[in-house]
């Protein structure tokens, strides 16, 4: 491959990768927002979380593949597609195993919610299953809501610093449901401080339940909101798939030129 052609591929790849990063960030935020609204009573969003995870690992795999090609090229060495596949086989298998684990959690959540023996408020437990899936995608998020010696407000502050919608919703739920045995005055103070932090961070208030847990009337209203959000997210995923194909084509061309 001549230097001019390689530079052309690299420029196209970097541009596409930037578009991909921007879109991934949008999908990530919409996924978190959807979980905040829906996770306390429904598991339908699990499929979208799973798809987002799958795309995340695919992007990671493609980036690694391009990185290896560039390393060999910089050393003036040749690497074939077969060699690349062999080098990345363990990474591919690990990703497949992780995805299978996530998929089972999503399906388990659905089975749980479809059971007639499970009451409306009992289904709030599903939120914890969602957290487990999300924390495996973003392990650092687990710190904010793990049992620690820090009080709930300190954990809320840390969640706000990270713009962590999922942890925020959980901490708010802890306060509203009084899971930490807060007095009424302590609970009022916490929610007031959390609302102030939201305003400081310019986080959209409509996505954050600074109040008691959803009642049935709110759930009906938020069902329509989430359905609209899911449509937008599916459009983003379609765009993500298009960009993924572009990346695959670029990588394929780089590999073919390298083989030649």
Residue ranges and their predicted role:
Residues 1-260:
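C-terminal accessory/regulatory regions appended to core domains
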């Amino acid at each position: 491959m001549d230097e001019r052609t390689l530079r052309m591929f690299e420029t196209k790849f970097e541009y596409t990768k930037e578009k991909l990063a921007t879109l991934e960030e949008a999908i990530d935020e919409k996924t978190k927002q959807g979980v905040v609204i829906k996770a306390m009573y429904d598991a339908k969003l699990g499929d979208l979380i799973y798809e987002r995870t799958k795309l995340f690992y695919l992007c990671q795999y493609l980036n690694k593949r391009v990185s290896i090609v560039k390393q060999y090229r910089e050393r003036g060495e040749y690497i074939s597609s077969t060699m690349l596949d062999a080098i990345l086989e363990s990474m591919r298998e690990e990703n497949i195993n992780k995805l299978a684990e996530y998929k089972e959690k999503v399906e388990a959540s659905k089975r749980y919610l479809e059971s007639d023996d499970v009451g409306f408020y009992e289904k709030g437990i599903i939120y914890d299953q969602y957290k487990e899936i999300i924390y495996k995608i973003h392990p650092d998020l687990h710190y904010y809501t793990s049992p620690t010696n820090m009080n709930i407000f300190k954990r809320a502050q840390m969640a706000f610093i990270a713009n962590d919608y999922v942890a925020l919703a959980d901490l708010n739920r802890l306060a509203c449901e009084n899971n930490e045995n807060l007095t009424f005055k302590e609970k009022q103070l916490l929610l007031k401080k959390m609302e102030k932090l939201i305003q400081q961070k310019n986080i959209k208030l409509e996505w954050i339940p600074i109040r008691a847990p959803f009642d049935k009337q709110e759930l009906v209203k938020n069902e329509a909101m989430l359905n609209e959000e899911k449509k937008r997210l599916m459009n983003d995923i379609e765009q993500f798939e298009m960009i993924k194909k572009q990346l695959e084509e670029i990588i394929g061309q780089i590999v073919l030129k390298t083989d030649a």
